[in-house]
């Protein structure tokens, strides 16, 4: 049984046109926001991203680490995204690293980081 969703999460989702039912799923008792919902909220919030900085890239080893900076109004946040065989089963580690980095930045800018 999932724990109750934090009221702050519901309020922030609503502010950016999302509902918990459509935007979230319960991952073993922890609420997680779907990537597609994060992308929609980022667009609605006017979040923009700088060109990512590649920290490590190896197609042969299927590893990618990037640093992404995003801006919303006058605030900026940055975060890493990483993918390797140890934490990624997909055949596209570079796209997965980008997704993870951008999602983390958006969660920080929207005030959801650490909540969802």
Pin down the residues of each PLM region:
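Polyanion-binding surfaces on beta-sheet-dominated domains and ring/shell assemblies
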Residues: 1-116
């Amino acid at each position: 049984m999932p724990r109750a969703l934090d009221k702050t999460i519901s309020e922030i989702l609503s502010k950016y046109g999302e509902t918990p039912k459509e935007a979230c799923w319960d991952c073993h008792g922890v609420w997680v926001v779907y990537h597609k919902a994060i992308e929609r909220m980022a667009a609605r919030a006017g979040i923009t991203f700088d060109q990512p900085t590649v920290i490590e890239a190896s197609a042969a080893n299927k590893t990618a680490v990037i640093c992404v900076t995003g801006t919303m109004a006058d605030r900026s946040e940055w975060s890493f995204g990483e993918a390797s065989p140890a934490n990624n089963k997909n055949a596209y580690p570079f796209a997965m690293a980008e997704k993870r980095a951008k999602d983390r930045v958006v969660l920080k800018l929207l005030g959801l980081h650490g909540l969802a």
